[in-house]
């Protein structure tokens, strides 16, 4: 679980720990409810294979009657240096199979995503090992600060909206 590919889970676990809430095992994943300023934020960690996470995303959007514009998908991104954050309104899957599956099942590329840079500091042919590998010492030292910013992003998205969140946090 402590791998670069699981940064989304790590961010959600950080928020849950910070807020004193816990995840419950439910259909297709684990869910925690964060109540903040009169709003309820549903945190979802799909338990499908990452490359099939669209199944859980689609199920929970439909079950909770959430518009795709009101969800924020967190994804690792090899094309961004470690810890770099990009929040986007829409886009391609960027070669990420989890996003590819979400887009297939939602029949759309138009949903907000939060891209967390994990860098591409691996040797040729070592991408899978790198992505599924644990954080190195230097990354671990910087991770807590990046998790704190990530937590603020999730809360800002829910309370201030996508555009305000993008303006405040993109590039930080």
For the regions a language model picked out, list residue spans one by one.
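Short glycine/threonine-rich catalytic loop with a Thr-x-Gly-x-Asp
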Residues: 92
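Nucleotide and nucleotide-moiety/phosphate-recognizing core
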Residues: 1-89, 100-114, 121-126, 133, ...
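Hydrophobic alpha-helical segments within soluble ligand-binding/sensing domains
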Residues: 95-98
């Amino acid at each position: 679980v402590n791998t670069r590919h699981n940064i989304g889970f790590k961010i959600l676990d950080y928020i849950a720990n910070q807020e004193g809430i816990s995840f419950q095992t439910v259909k297709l994943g684990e869910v925690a409810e964060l109540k903040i300023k009169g709003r309820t934020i549903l945190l979802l960690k799909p338990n499908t294979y990452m490359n099939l996470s669209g199944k859980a995303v689609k199920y929970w959007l439909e079950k909770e009657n959430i518009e795709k514009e009101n969800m924020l998908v967190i994804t690792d991104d090899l094309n961004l240096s470690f810890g770099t954050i990009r929040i986007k309104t829409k886009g391609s899957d960027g070669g990420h199979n989890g996003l590819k599956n979400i887009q297939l099942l939602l029949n759309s590329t138009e949903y907000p995503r939060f891209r967390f840079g994990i860098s591409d500091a691996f040797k040729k042919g070592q991408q899978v090992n790198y992505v599924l590998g644990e954080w190195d010492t230097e990354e671990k030292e910087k991770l807590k600060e990046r998790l704190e910013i990530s937590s603020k992003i999730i809360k800002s998205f829910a309370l201030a909206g996508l555009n305000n969140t993008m303006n405040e946090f993109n590039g930080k």
